[in-house]
Amino acid sequence: MAHALFNQSAKSNSPLAKPTEAAGEARENQLFNEIRDVRRNVEINIGKACNNRCVFCIDGLPKREDRSYMPYEDMRRELKFWYDSGSRSVGFLGGEPTTYPWIVQSTAYARELGFTRIAIATNATKLRLRHFTDKLLDAGLTRVTISMHGHTAELEERLTRVPKVYAKKCEAIRYLVEKKKEGYLPDGLSVNIVLNGWNYRALPKMMRFFYDDLGLDDLRINFVRPEGYAEGDPEICPPFPKVVPYLIKAIALSERHWKRETFTFGGFPLCTLPPALRNNETLLKRYMGEYRDLSTDCSVRQEGDGFGIEQIEDGRSRFNWQDRKRFDLKNAPDACHTCSKVHLCEGVWRGYIDIHGDDEFTPV
C-alpha cells in the first residue's frame, strides 16, 4: 500500500511525489541557502547501546543485536564506501558513539580517507574525561553536537533518567568550549534540544543558560518525534499550538540578545507558524533547520527487507535522511496537497497525528 504522502495524482516533479532512484541519488531535495554547508554528509550508526535512557528515545529498548557495536572492519568499509560515493562529511551516531570501542580509530581513519568534516552526536557524559576528548580531537574530530534538554539538574535528569548526569554534561561542555577557543572543532560545537512537553516552557531560560552561562554559540531545537518511549504519549508530545508561542519568543530573544549566535529549529510544520515567520524568507533562512541542514545520507544496521526508500546491502540500511522523513516517517495530511509551502515543509511526524489527529493543519 502506498504511503499517505504519495499523492497518486501528483506530477513527478511535485514535492508530494515519491522520488525516482536517480533523483534520490542526486539529493536535490533542499532549497538553496547561501549559508548552507554544501558538503555531502553521511551519518553512520555505530549501534544502539546508550548510557542514557531519555523518556523520548525513538529506539525505546533496542533488541540485544541492535545494542551490539558495529565491527571495526565493517566501519572501515562503510567509511570507504561513502567517501568513494562523494561524501566529505561524516557523523557518528548511536546509541552513544563515545562508548564505541573504536571511535578514536574510526575518527582517525575518516581523516586519513579525506573527510574534511568529522562529527559525533553525543550525550557528552564521557567527554568530561579530558584525556579521552583530547584523543578524539587529535584524531581529527571537527564538530560535536550534544544532546542536552534541560537547564537544571532536575529537568535534565528527569528527561534522561540518569542521576548526576547534568554536572557531567556541563563539565564536558565547558571543556569543549575551551578547546574550541584553542582552534579545535572548526565545524562547531552545538547543543541539540529535543523540545517536548516537559521542557518547552523553559526554552527562554535554556537559551540564556547555554549561551550566557556555558558560552555556547550554536543551539538547535527539534520538536519531539513521538516514537519509541514517547509513542502515544500526549504528555511528552504536546500539541503545536501550545509550543509555537515559546518558539516565537525564542526567535525574538535571538534577534534581540543573541544575533551573533546560531539558533535553529526543526520539526515544525510551516502551517503551525505565524504568517510573519513562515512568509519571511530571511527569517526562515536564518532560523529554520530545513533551510540550513546538510544533505545527509544514513547508514544503520538492518536485518530483513526494511521499508520505504531504504536500500539494504551488507546488513546496512542506507537512505537519505531528508527523503526518509518526507516519504517514510512523516505524513502529509490532505491540507498539504494544496499548500503553497509543500516544497519546503516535510509534513508531520506520523506519531503526532496518532496522538492529536490532523484537524489543526491547514493549507497556506
Residue map of PLM features:
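Flexible mid-to-C-terminal extensions adjoining Fe-S/redox cofactors in radical SAM and related proteins
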Residues: 2-15, 19-33, 290-364
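Processing junctions and N-termini across compartments
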Residues: 44, 48-51, 265, 330-333
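Cys/His-rich zinc-coordinating "finger/knuckle" motifs
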Residues: 57, 61-64, 278, 343-346, ...
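Conserved alpha-helical substructure of the radical SAM core
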Residues: 3-12, 16-131, 135-139, 143
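Radical SAM enzyme [4Fe-4S]-AdoMet core and its adjacent flexible, acidic
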Residues: 6-8, 154, 162-170, 174, ...
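Radical SAM/AdoMet-radical enzyme domain recognition
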Residues: 72-91, 100-224
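Residues that line or immediately flank small-molecule/substrate-binding pockets and catalytic motifs
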Residues: 61, 94, 122, 148, ...
